Amino acid sequence: MSHDISVETCCNVEINKETIDRFDVFDYVPQGYETKKYDYGAPSRNMAANLTGKKAPEWTLNDIKERPVSLSDLKSKVILVNITGIGCGACQASIPFLKELKRKYQEEDFELVAIESWSRMHSLQNYAKRKELNYMFLDGDDKVIEDYRTGGAAPYFFILDKERIIRKVIRGYGMGKTDKEITEAIEELL
């Protein structure tokens, strides 16, 4: 296999003169391409972390067998709500920990619920089967994303107490660090 490599010297090149205050990514998205525009840079009152200490927003979503499940249906003392995306690398990296967490607390008053925020039912069913998920996996909707203030980002972990008050919000996943943070929050509430 041959390779052609050409090298040229460039001097005083200006590639991008656009300033951040005038830049809008949606100017570069093809016309007709479906997009969602969230309030980037909006005041922090819209952030998920500001839900700590507040009642968790209620939802009714379908599980992978297309049966409705509501937050109010869950009677466990502690609930971990994981807002996830099946195309999200960090979300996939968290799966072994979440499966172990479900096994570890199976005799405790604990429930783990993952809410998929990016795809739809057929994809969820295949994903849950392929990943051998041992916890509840629900088909999310835009209202959950809005109510939980994730802005479409994933993963998020919301730890709820028996009164369904959000006691801790964790954004992102870092193996080891996030595992410890979630486990400590659950232990504190059990």
Segments (PLM) and residue ranges:
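Hydrophobic beta-strand anchors of alpha/beta hydrolase catalytic cores
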Residues: 80-81, 112, 157
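Non-transmembrane domains of secretory- and envelope-associated proteins
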Residues: 1-60, 65-67, 74
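Generic structural signal for well-ordered beta-strand positions
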Residues: 69-70, 167
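Conserved redox-active cysteine motifs that mediate thiol-disulfide chemistry
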Residues: 75, 83-100
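Thiol/disulfide oxidoreductase modules built on the thioredoxin-like
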Residues: 127-133, 139-187
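Structural microenvironment flanking redox-active thiols in thiol-disulfide oxidoreductases
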Residues: 92-131, 141-147
